[in-house]
């Protein structure tokens, strides 16, 4: 996957020119008047993909795909994000002040009713598995150097106190059920277990989970369950059980971050909370090899959009600037009550 996305062309930039409402409407209808472009929009429902990844999914040459992406971009149905030297495409966020917002939302709703062909679904699963294996392989090889690698980006003490202030300010009962995804060496996990009656640690790396288990044992705690697997596995056993789910500097290691929000929504009780501590979007591509990062942080709007699509409402957030140029964002989301 890494090689497949590293040599992509520049994104399509729409010229800053005056476009009449009639032209906007024509561009939108043109973009939607092609079955392949509708397939592309369907694939982009939950995730972002590089050009060569999309070529693989829809089985066409890059030159042909580039034409379709240009048409979709001109209609403002797709947008781009840069990941180092790579360009990823996603669905554009629809704003309320867009005069064609209702039409675009209706178009996306209609596209989402389309089935993904079996061949595409198989390629999609394979691609996501390859992304996951990149991250898993890194942590299998570097579990003992976790703190050292993480310290290249941020030292825990730079945000620990702010993080615990957020946790303590959530107003949760000590009887709360808490889930931490990707607990690393267990530093936050220990603090959560000291505060709450029931805590579950979820990680797809046995080596990392063993480090967390050792940290809990060293602190003499016995109220933590350990689950080897992904968030999709966790929702099978913990569906609707969690008062709080925490991602602490983990989302940028996850192959399908948007889908992960849907898993979290399934884990949470009604009115439950999601706390995300994550890097803001950056351009330091070296973290891929040095720290096992799949994504170069995230924009606030991306996290908010994925949360909203999963029935999670933004509650509060704050950013912390670090001396090395990275920024950390802390964002709290609440599950909508039915």
Where are the regions that the model predicts?
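C-terminal alpha-helical "lid/dimerization" subdomain adjacent to the S-adenosyl-L-methionine
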Residues: 273-331
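A short SAM/SAH-binding and catalytic strip from SAM-dependent methyltransferases
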Residues: 244-256
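A short acidic, Gly/Pro-enriched loop at the edge of an enzyme's catalytic core
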Residues: 236-245
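A short glycine-rich, Lys/Arg-flanked "PGG" loop and its adjoining helix->strand segment in the class I
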Residues: 258-273
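Amphipathic alpha-helical dimerization/coiled-coil segments
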Residues: 2-17, 96-145
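Class I SAM-dependent methyltransferase SAM/SAH-binding core
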Residues: 179, 185-234
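Conserved alpha-helix/loop element of class I SAM-dependent methyltransferases that forms part
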Residues: 154-176
């Amino acid at each position: 996957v890494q090689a497949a996305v590293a040599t992509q062309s520049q994104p399509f930039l729409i010229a800053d020119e005056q476009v009449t409402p009639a032209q906007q409407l024509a561009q939108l209808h043109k973009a939607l008047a092609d079955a392949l472009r509708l397939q592309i929009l369907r694939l982009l429902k939950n995730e972002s993909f590089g050009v060569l990844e999309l070529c693989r999914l829809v089985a066409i040459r890059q030159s042909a795909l580039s034409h379709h992406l240009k048409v979709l971009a001109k209609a403002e149905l797709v947008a781009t994000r840069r990941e180092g030297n790579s360009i990823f495409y996603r669905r554009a966020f629809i704003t309320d002040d867009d005069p064609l917002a209702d039409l675009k939302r209706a178009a996306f709703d209609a596209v989402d009713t389309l089935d993904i062909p079996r061949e595409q679904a198989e390629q999609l699963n394979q691609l996501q598995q390859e992304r996951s294996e990149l991250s898993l392989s890194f942590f299998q090889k570097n579990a003992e150097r976790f703190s050292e690698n993480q310290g290249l980006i941020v030292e825990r003490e730079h945000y620990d106190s702010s993080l615990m202030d957020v946790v303590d300010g959530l107003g949760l009962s000590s009887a709360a059920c808490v889930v931490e995804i990707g607990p690393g060496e267990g530093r936050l996990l220990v603090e959560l277990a000291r505060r709450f009656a029931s805590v579950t640690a979820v990680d797809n790396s046995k080596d990392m989970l063993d480090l967390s288990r050792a940290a809990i044992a060293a602190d003499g705690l016995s109220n933590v369950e350990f689950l080897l697997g992904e968030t999709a596995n966790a929702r099978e056993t913990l569906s609707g059980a969690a008062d709080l789910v925490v991602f602490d500097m983990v989302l940028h290691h996850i192959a399908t971050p948007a889908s992960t929000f849907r898993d979290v929504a399934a884990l949470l009780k009604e009115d439950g909370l999601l706390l995300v501590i994550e890097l803001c979007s950056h351009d330091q591509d070296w973290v891929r090899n040095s720290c096992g990062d799949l994504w170069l942080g995230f924009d606030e709007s991306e996290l908010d959009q994925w949360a909203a699509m999963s029935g999670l409402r933004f509650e509060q957030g704050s950013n912390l600037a670090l001396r090395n140029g990275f920024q950390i964002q802390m964002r709290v989301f609440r599950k909508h009550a039915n």
